[in-house]
Regions:
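Carbohydrate-associated surface elements
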Residues: 40, 169, 191
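Nucleotide-activated donor-binding/catalytic signature segment of Leloir-type glycosyltransferases, i.e.
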Residues: 262-282
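Acidic donor-binding loop of glycosyltransferase active sites
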Residues: 288-299, 312-313
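Short hydrophobic beta-strand element within catalytic cores of glycosyltransferases
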Residues: 313-316, 320-323
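Conserved donor-binding/catalytic core segment of Leloir-type glycosyltransferases
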Residues: 4, 164, 213-229, 235-238, ...
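Membrane-proximal helix-turn-helix segments that form the acceptor-binding/catalytic region
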Residues: 22, 114-118, 131, 143-165, ...
Length: 388
């Protein structure tokens, strides 16, 4: 079997840990040929000039591991409107048995559907959009999602064999906004890169490396941080625990970027906080693994799946985008307030050995459930099932 991944709307950035990168890698490891077709000239704004130059220097055809990468020209007419050139030629050259189109919101989808229909092969599409990250302009959201994409999906629905949402809310979005038949919709969560996670040294070694003691209780959070992400409340909760229990040795590690000046000043002035800038993939996993708990008080981030990969317990708010991420491997909070965070951290801080052991078993189970090995296996089963 040969699967081609169309990553025009969802950018494919060499060496990153997004689903577009990891799913082809793990499917390849399962013995299935994988190819990726991505833009060769349109890259996210957050990439540096050097990163873009490094990708372009590889040319239009190269491999990462055993996954074949094909870069094609695209033209962006607006933030939401990206047009690929010679996509059909690229697909025909690969001659796939399956097309996996990443995201619904791109003009590449009807092209992929036309090839799939003409050659009688399965078309699978995933969705990362929901009501939280869609446009807040209601008129534009209706025109773009319900009319433009919805009418496109209606025209090609018979060709789509599976429509995946990466969370339950994004499964609901597929039905409500795109009109896809409920029978075709399924959850395919963002997974855990267990291969790289298993190469990270032990917690003891990492604490020595970063200057922490075995008796320290380390809380970690990262990514884009600030008031909107609840980082200010996380700092406040940690400081309260330190004040009320000076012997707790609680410490807060933050990495990434704090986006508002007030929270940045709060973090710099706090005696419990250590700040790191953006980290590469290895250092990110190291900081997550050395911690006793990882906390994101308000919104989902793919760093949560990274924490799952290294078996670090979680404190997160239960929402439609996170409700599948805790089952014995952490604590839900009802809101992102300092009081809610403090209660959850205190529970973990005061656990007896039996509860710690049970929590660790829960972490291992969630790691196995979200492993990209498990997710790749599901995709293969779904594809074979669609052919019966």
């Amino acid at each position: 079997m040969k699967i081609v991944h169309i990553c025009i709307s969802a950018p494919y950035i060499d060496g990153w840990g997004y689903q577009e990168n990891l799913l082809p890698k793990y499917l390849q490891q399962a013995g299935i040929q994988n190819a990726v077709i991505a833009s060769g000239n349109d890259f996210p704004f957050y990439l540096s000039t050097q990163e873009i130059s490094d990708i372009k220097a590889k040319g239009e055809n190269y491999t990462i591991g055993e996954v074949y990468i094909k870069r094609i020209k695209t033209k962006r007419f607006s933030t939401s409107f990206l047009v690929p050139f010679h996509l059909m030629d690229a697909i025909e050259a690969i001659q796939p048995d399956v097309i996996f189109h990443h995201n619904f919101n791109c003009t590449s989808l009807p092209i992929a559907a036309r090839y799939a229909k003409r050659n009688n092969i399965p078309l699978v599409v995933d969705n990362h959009a929901d009501v939280l990250n869609m446009s807040h302009n209601r008129i534009w959201a209706f025109v773009y999602y319900k009319l433009l994409i919805g009418l496109t999906c209606k025209a090609i629905q018979k060709t789509i064999v599976k429509a995946y949402g990466v969370s339950h809310s994004r499964c609901d979005f597929i039905k409500e906004y795109y009109g896809i038949d409920q029978k075709k919709i399924d959850l395919l969560p963002i997974g855990a890169d267990v291969d790289i996670a298993d190469t990270i040294p032990s917690k003891e070694i990492l604490r020595q490396k970063y200057g922490y003691q075995e008796t320290d209780f380390i809380v970690v959070s990262g990514g884009k941080m600030g008031v909107e992400k609840g980082t200010d409340q996380l700092i406040l909760a940690t400081e309260r625990i330190r004040k009320n229990n000076p012997n707790s040795r609680i410490k807060l590690v933050l990495f990434g970027k704090i986006e508002d000046e007030d929270t940045l000043l709060q973090a710099k002035q706090s005696q419990v906080v250590t700040l790191f800038d953006w980290c590469d993939r290895i250092k990110t996993l190291e900081l997550l693994k050395m911690a006793d708990v990882a906390c994101w008080p308000i919104h989902h981030t793919t760093l949560i799946e990274d924490a799952v990969a290294v078996c670090t317990p979680l404190i997160i708010r239960k929402t439609d985008t996170t409700e599948h991420l805790i089952e014995g491997n952490g604590i839900w909070i009802e809101n992102g307030s300092a009081e809610a965070i403090e209660r959850a951290m205190s529970l973990l801080l005061n656990q007896d050995e039996m509860r710690k052991s049970a929590m660790q078993q829960g972490c291992e189970k969630m790691k196995n459930r979200l492993s990209y090995n498990t997710i790749a296996e599901k995709v293969v089963k779904d594809i074979y099932g669609s052919r019966q």
